Amino acid sequence: MAFLADALSRVKPSATIAVSQKARELKAKGRDVIGLGAGEPDFDTPDNIKKAAIDAIDRGETKYTPVSGIPELREAIAKKFKRENNLDYTAAQTIVGTGGKQILFNAFMATLNPGDEVVIPAPYWVSYPEMVALCGGTPVFVPTRQENNFKLKAEDLDRAITPKTKWFVFNSPSNPSGAAYSHEELKALTDVLMKHPHVWVLTDDMYEHLTYGDFRFATPVEVEPGLYERTLTMNGVSKAYAMTGWRIGYAAGPLHLIKAMDMIQGQQTSGAASIAQWAAVEALNGPQDFIGRNKEIFQGRRDLVVSMLNQAKGISCPTPEGAFYVYPSCAGLIGKTAPSGKVIETDEDFVSELLETEGVAVVHGSAFGLGPNFRISYATSEALLEEACRRIQRFCAACR
């Protein structure tokens, strides 16, 4: 009898975590490595949020909390959805988890049965299909195209839906591509979803506040209120407020789904860390100027990286609307010989050779379900980004 569960055979380790770990190992050995694999802001958590956590400690807010979150945070979440997304939820329709990942996992665990399908546009965040598989479902991938800026077309979504489809997973702005959908682009997708009343929508809005220029963020149920009773809208404080380590995600949706997720979480982790929840209350209710300042910084970094990558031989990099990633194509390098003498046959070969030759760590696109591409996180200083892009240019020029 095997000791480990059969379910593990359906799951792969996280490629993004693996890249960051590899970069750390090389740095520990003395290598000059620039790591561009991390999916977190390089800013510190704002002082007012840290102070709220310290105040909570001083007040003795160190006990177990209700499974779905402290009332103050659930009220703040409901107000946030009304204020920023024009969505009406009661506090009872919200839930707080230990990061957005737990929210998503609990939603799948609460709803998926063997044979249920989950439609996921590619490229996708690496954890979506793995969570679906762990929960007994079947991921169904729908490739997007670079010429469409990696945005799903309505007709492709329509073709992917079957009687077995239970969820459509929607992420805008996207990890890994940075693609963000306009109101009009979203309306085309929601029109399709209205034709299929058995399909639920799981929307990952974690990068909501990281859009650039005049782009206006919208979320599916805001665009099509008819989806309200079958949409779970997930968000969190990690990206917008530089709070990745605090591990607070949240969602709002139909009460019966929230109750089911609460039941699972109650037998899993119970409530998220009390101090982190009080910090999240301040993040949502307190001053929001931190977000605007950081958007300007990220936009400058994005423009720098896109410009420099498009000067590299064999690289094509579209300009994303949001998040802090770019997703360039390395198709022009496939079939070329790297400085080491190895022929680059895949995007995985490209990123491996780039790391060994130039010490730049990025994530191969095949990990996100669409290649030959690679993901760069520009959540680091302009000086490091400029140096990394120079190294990429040098590597590409040396390929023959």
Swiss-Prot record:
The GO terms describing molecular function are: glutamate-prephenate aminotransferase activity; L-aspartate:2-oxoglutarate aminotransferase activity; pyridoxal phosphate binding
Please name the InterPro entries in this protein's record. Aminotransferase_I/II_large, AspAT/PAT-like, NHTrfase_class1_PyrdxlP-BS, PyrdxlP-dep_Trfase, PyrdxlP-dep_Trfase_major, PyrdxlP-dep_Trfase_small
**Where is this chain primarily localised?**
cytoplasm
Parts forming coiled coils: none
Query: Which residues are recorded as binding L-aspartate?
Result: 39, 125, 175, 375
Pfam families registered for this protein in UniProt: Aminotran_1_2
List the EC numbers from the record: 2.6.1.1, 2.6.1.79
Q: Which PROSITE patterns match?
A: AA_TRANSFER_CLASS_1 (PS00105)
Cofactor(s) recorded in Swiss-Prot or TrEMBL: pyridoxal 5'-phosphate
Catalytic activity, as annotated: L-aspartate + 2-oxoglutarate = oxaloacetate + L-glutamate; L-arogenate + 2-oxoglutarate = prephenate + L-glutamate
Q: What class of enzyme is it?
A: transferase
Cellular-component GO terms for this entry = cytoplasm
Q: Tell me, which GO biological process terms does this entry list?
A: amino acid metabolic process; biosynthetic process
Family to which this protein belongs:
Belongs to the class-I pyridoxal-phosphate-dependent aminotransferase family.
Q: Briefly state the protein's biological role.
A: Catalyzes the reversible conversion of aspartate and 2-oxoglutarate to glutamate and oxaloacetate. Can also transaminate prephenate in the presence of glutamate. Required for symbiotic nitrogen fixation.
| Subunit comment | Homodimer.
Name the chain's protein.
Answer: Aspartate/prephenate aminotransferase
